[in-house]
From Swiss-Prot:
One of its GO terms (cellular component) is cytosolic large ribosomal subunit. The lineage of its organism: Bacteria, Bacillati, Actinomycetota, Actinomycetes, Mycobacteriales. GO terms for molecular function: structural constituent of ribosome. GO terms for biological process: translation. Keywords: Ribonucleoprotein, Ribosomal protein. The keyword Nucleotide-binding does not apply. Residues 127-157 are annotated as: Disordered. Belongs to the bacterial ribosomal protein bL17 family. Residues 140-157 have a biased composition (Acidic residues). It comes from Corynebacterium diphtheriae (strain ATCC 700971 / NCTC 13129 / Biotype gravis). PROSITE patterns: RIBOSOMAL_L17. This is Large ribosomal subunit protein bL17. NCBIfam families: L17. Part of the 50S ribosomal subunit. Contacts protein L32.
Length: 157
């Protein structure tokens, strides 16, 4: 017999927590960014990342597995048709959590969880950009040094 998760749960019962996560995931996929409490955002991140990984597969079985958790067909269609192709080259890390100010009413710590839709830059590309920038910075310095002796010779004459 499976034992329930230890510790605090969102909403009290395990079934309520599942519903909360399903609703938050639906809203995140629909709006691509939502504002929620830190605890909910931290629990939502792996939940959504697993759904996106399944959506990248694109098979009918994957679509049915995702539909078990997200019941709105329009949101499932958006996940498979719009979002999954954007994450084709990314191997995880589909979401980002940004800490916000505490909520005014009860001082609860708040966060914004959003989908990372920007293209990733490889380490090689950043190295190449840094090398190009350093070469560009060295060229003006060498040009100034070359001009300085010529100016000194002109002053002596």
């Amino acid at each position: 017999m499976p034992t329930p998760k230890k510790g605090a749960r969102l909403g009290g019962s395990a079934s309520h927590q599942k519903k909360i996560l399903a609703n938050l995931a639906s809203q995140l996929i629909e709006h691509e960014a939502i504002k929620t409490t830190d605890a909910k955002a931290k629990l939502l991140r792996p939940y959504v990342e697993k759904l996106i990984t399944k959506a990248k597969g694109g098979s009918v079985a994957d679509r049915r597995n995702v539909a078990k958790f997200i019941t709105n067909k329009e949101i499932v269609a958006k996940l498979f048709n719009e979002l999954a192709p954007k994450f084709e080259n990314r191997e995880g890390g589909y979401t980002r959590i940004i800490k916000l100010e505490n909520r005014k009413g009860d001082n609860a710590p708040m966060s914004q969880i959003s989908l990372v839709l920007e293209e990733t830059v490889s380490a090689e590309a950043t190295r190449a950009a840094r090398a190009a920038a350093s070469k560009k910075a060295e060229e003006p310095a060498e040009a100034v040094e070359a001009e300085a002796p010529a100016a000194d010779e002109a002053e002596e004459k």
